[in-house]
């Protein structure tokens, strides 16, 4: 299939923080209708150079895809990218001995002839919406999510649990990592083969989620406003209600040639040996 995109809308703001630890690829105002790869990262911990971690991870993704000639990403490609990001972290830590660790979330969207590949680690999200409804959403890698699934706490309790912001997965390196020890980085990878004209993909860091829930997102994207106005509406809500950095990408699908009527989803969870 051939996927034609509207002009992508991106934003990244401080919120009520003193520095922005989110990073986007392409940077704000750099994407075009021809852009196929979108990356949203949220660095962890101000003292641990979260803004550097998110930038290094975005750069690892972009550099790999450009160097390899824009391959359709699969689990093997993603693992190479994560290994390179991990090594970039290790190098930075070695050059900055006052730091003990660094890490970032990852949300990745690649549009290609087979549809859309989505990869994520942590709690930065990717949504697919159609006709004003979310039809796909990544699952946050948070400790409370695992506790809910295990029946330890309820979904309601998770909302106020003291561990609600703790990640169960992230792209992370620490000075305590042993040299030569196998890298254990985990990514959820999904390929969506049902992409249709009028669909939206929305990617965001968790700061956006302080202001925007599923109902609000569906309502805004179902409106008759142009894409720029939709993006501005989401940003206005975040400006009013988000304490954290908030960043996102809104990608509208304008036309798809040879769209299949049925949705096929192939999910791979990749664990490094």
Q: How would you describe each model-predicted region?
A:
Residues 1-273:
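PP2C/PPM-type serine/threonine phosphatase catalytic domain
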């Amino acid at each position: 299939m051939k996927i034609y995109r509207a002009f992508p809308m991106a934003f990244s703001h401080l919120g009520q923080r003193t520095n922005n630890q989110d990073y986007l690829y392409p940077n704000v105002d750099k994407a075009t209708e021809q852009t196929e790869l979108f990356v949203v990262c949220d660095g962890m911990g101000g003292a641990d150079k979260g803004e550097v971690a998110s930038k290094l991870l975005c750069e690892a993704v972009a550099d790999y895809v450009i160097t390899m000639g824009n391959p359709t990403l699969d689990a093997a490609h993603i693992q190479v990218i994560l290994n390179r990001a991990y090594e970039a972290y290790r190098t930075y830590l070695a050059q900055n001995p006052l730091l003990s660790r660094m890490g970032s979330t990852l949300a990745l969207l690649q549009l290609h002839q087979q549809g859309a590949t989505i990869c994520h680690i942590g709690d930065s999200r990717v949504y697919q919406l159609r006709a004003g409804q979310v039809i796909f959403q990544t699952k946050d890698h948070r400790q409370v999510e695992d506790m809910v699934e295990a029946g330890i706490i309820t979904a309601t309790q998770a909302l106020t649990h003291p561990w609600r912001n703790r990640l169960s997965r992230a792209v992370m390196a620490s000075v305590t990592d042993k040299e030569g020890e196998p890298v254990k980085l985990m990514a959820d990878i999904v390929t969506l083969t049902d992409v249709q004209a009028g669909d939206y993909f929305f990617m965001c860091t968790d700061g956006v989620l302080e202001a925007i829930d599923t109902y609000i997102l569906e309502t805004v994207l179902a409106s008759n406003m142009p894409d720029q106005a939709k993006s501005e509406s989401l940003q206005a809500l975040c400006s009013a209600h988000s304490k954290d950095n908030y960043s996102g990408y809104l990608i509208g699908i304008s036309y798809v040639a040879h769209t299949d009527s049925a949705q096929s989803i192939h999910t791979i969870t990749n664990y490094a040996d």
